[in-house]
C-alpha cells in the first residue's frame, strides 16, 4: 500500500517533504500530487475516487488558508485521510487547522498539528501497519531509537551536573 501526499499548492512542498521523507524512511511508496480543492475540484474528486484502486491506503492532504482539500478528498473515498494544516501568513495556520478539524459527522479527517508533516507521515505508516507486521516492527524500532536518543541526552545532561 502507498501513502499519497496531496497538497493544494506547490508552495506547501517544503513542509510536505518532511512527511514524504518520513514515510519513505519506512520503505513505503509515496504518490505526490498538487490538486486544489477550489481550482481543480474535478481532479480532487477523481483522485479520491480512484485512490484505493491505485494502491493508496492513506491520503495526507496538506493545505493552507481555507484548507478544504482533506474534506473534499474524504467525501469521495473510504480510505483514511489525514489533514495537514499548513502555516500561511494569515492567522499563522490557525485558519487552516480549524478548516480541517471542523468536519461534519460521517466525513472524518484525522488532523495533525500545523506544519506537522513528520507526524502526518508517522500516523499514515501506523494506519498501514494495522495490517502489516513488517511495518509494525519498523515502527517499534523507530520508537525505541527515539527513546534511546532521549536516554543518551538525559545521561549527558545529568553527567554535567553530578
Question: What label would you give each PLM region?
Answer:
Residues 91-137:
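Short, glycine-/small-residue-rich phosphate/pyrophosphate-handling segment
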Residues 47-85:
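Glycine-rich phosphate-binding loop
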Residues 128-162:
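Glycine-rich phosphate/pyrophosphate-binding loop and the adjoining helix
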Residues 20, 45-48, 75, 92-104:
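Active-site-proximal loop->helix
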Residues 32-53:
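N-terminal beta-loop-helix "entrance" segment that forms/cooperates
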